[in-house]
Each structure stands twice: as C-alpha cells, then as structure tokens.
Amino acid sequence: MIITTKGDILKSNAQAIVNPVNTVGVMGKGLALQIRESFPNVYNIYRNACKLGKVQIGKMFVVSTGLTSHPEYIINFPTKKHWKEKSKLWYIQQGLDDLVEVIQQRNIHSVALPAIGCGLGRLDWNVVYEVIDMKLSNLPDSVVVFVYEPYFGREGKKRPSILQQYSQPHKMNWR
C-alpha cells in the first residue's frame, strides 16, 4: 500500500527509511546529511562499503540502526554515482526493483521513501512518482510505503505528469 505524505521523514514510525546516496561515500547535503548526523554508525558503515566498491547503482545497501525503536533499518539507495552528478531515471528504476526484493527478503512491513533523485538529483517528481507507483504497487497490502513528497516552494504546486503533458499532440515539444 502506497501512502503519500509530507513532513520530516526522520520522524517517521516506519521500520525502514530509504536514504538517497551516491556510490563514492559522501553524505554532504539533503536527507543524506541528516542521516549522517542522526546515525553516524550508518554513515561510517556506508562510507567504508563505498571504499570497497560494495555500494552500487541498482542495489540497496541496508544498514541496521541498532535501535529497538524505529527506524530499524536505513536503506541506502544509490541515485547517482558521484555526488556532483545528476540522478538518472534508469538508476531509480533499477533501484526500485531491488528495493522490492529487500523489503520481501527482510520482511519489512513499513518503509519511508523520500522523493528519490528529485532534490539534488534534479529528476522530475511527477515522473519519478509514476515509476514508484508502478514498481511498488504490487507489494502486499501488509507492506506500507510512506512516500514523502518534495517541497516545491511556497505555492506547493506540482507540474502535470509527463503522461498528462504529452497526452495531446499539440502539447508536445519536439526540440
């Protein structure tokens, strides 16, 4: 079951929080920095794994927080190879496939998922959300995925989805 929400993902009661990361071991901005500051042990494990080449695009790098309360896991989700790069939709698609496997293998019943790749990664939220919905909607109803929508500024406006934008021929931009 997918539930969209807003707010501070670190205050989520979900069993696992997804953390968008790169594969070079830097958690310098955004949610990754907040995770680094809140869970220094998770950061150290992730950084060392990056040095060993164990954090790869398309594969979740799961770290136990060691907490008896939530979150039990931080699921590091590589959305870009280097922190200087933009995210690629292909990376999100591959990663979501692996996230489904991780959720099932670890019997995770609730996940807090940010707008992966849409902040510093600069992907379009409407497109990414459609991919999230497509990839995660087949999870059992006993699994709850809290999808945290991005903040778009004071107006809080979202652009129409890609499907809506291009549903009529006269709206297509062929440049």
What are these regions (language model features)?
Residues 1-175:
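Macrodomain-like recognition of ADP-ribose-binding/processing modules
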